[in-house]
Amino acid sequence: MQPNRRETLSLLAGVAPAALGMLSAVATTNGSLAQETKPNILFMLADNVGYGVPSSYNGGILDTPTPRLDKFAAEGLRLTNFNVENQCTPSRAALMTGRLPIRSGIGKAIAAGAPGGLHPWEITVAEMLGDAGYRTAMFGKWHLGAGQGRLPTDQGFDEWFGFETTDIIYWAGKPGMPLRDVHYIREAKKGETPRNIRVYDEDTRRQVDRMLTDRAVDYISKSRSGDRPFFLYVPFAFSHHPALAHPDFKGKSPGGEFGDSLLEHDHNVGSILDALTAAGLSDNTMVIWASDNGPSPLPTVTPQWTIGDAGPWRGEIGTVLEGNIRTPCMIRWPGRIPGGRVSNHIVAILDFFPTLARIAGGKVPTDRPMDGVDQSAFFTGKQENSNRDHVLLFLGQKLMAVKWRNFKIHLDGLDRVDGVIEDWSFPRAFNLAADPKERWNIIWQNTWLGEEIGPFVAAYEASVKKYPNLAGGQPNGEPPRYGAENAAAETGVEAVPRKLESIRQH
């Protein structure tokens, strides 16, 4: 049934700042949630873990228990409508900057060895928190550029141990692959040239998450006597294909290689949480666990490439179907975030930048469009509703869909990451509450949906006219100047007005 128009207009007015892609120009967050002793922040990011993988989501479809993740979920807030971007690089760019990745020319994952990545001009969450007095460390997968000036220690992290991307493990040791294409686990501190630690091959892939966990545990232990709060970012290799478990977990689950890897991941998360407890830091540490994308099911390759499950949703990585863009996310902060809470309100990975700024007393940039919204009051239970009711979903440089409340309006179609985008002349709409597989088009009975999403698209387009999206792969050097000379060729929404008009005509 069509919602009350007064209610709709009121709600639209309330989200206007988010729709415009701009946060209020509040330079600091004094009087915020930041305590006299600022909280530590620990962010653990899993790779391609679908909605149906943790037992606390959908009952654990894979029959592999995740007791530590389940306990963690029960101790805080479990989000069931957490939204990410279409692939690894865009999701990580959104997390780091609080901006739609298309604004920086990032539309898809960066291929191993390819140029580009997050421009040094971007302000990352690590830089923002560092300026707010935090020590910053990252142990894990970056996937936001491997060139000079684009590694984690160039983008706000005091130290980094990890790897640029995961696909590169297939190259090492293979016949015909030149030595220059061998990649390594690397390590650096700010201002240093990264050092090669170990060849990143399939054997190392089995070991790497244990290595990251050990680094995180050691960092937390040493932080017991620290005089400054820390921001620790741990983006695991799990569960990016191929699923390769540590030898200690080989054959320990009923779920094959992937199940073994899942058991290991649950154990690693538990080890890091136990380190917080042992150091006496649990009560003053905000901990976030999330996944950057949905599953990557490729059973035609090898069993090790068949990873994860999207639960009740349809879709896989590289699409904007719910199975990819709706992933598990859990947040714990004892005494500040009520335990045992579950919410189906829309939250986006974009929202962590302004939310953490509010919590830590950091500054949000005011010289560029910001798309994330502050969710601190929602997370801490001071308000029931999220400050977001919609997300714009891009693929490459193209707006593919708009999700608003329980409705999803697809402007074009793509069912598989290796498929071809279908250019639809008429949008399709789905009621996610009744149709989680996004199969039953309801646009003919609900043409009014075009009027609802129109303002969101128009607001984004207006912001792009003022601050043109940057072309991808921009070189290092001077900060980009907003203007035609640096603008991307397309905004990603050129065809949308025509498609929305086709709805109005019916």
Pin down the residues of each PLM region.
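Formylglycine-dependent sulfatase
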Residues: 2-423, 427, 432, 436-506
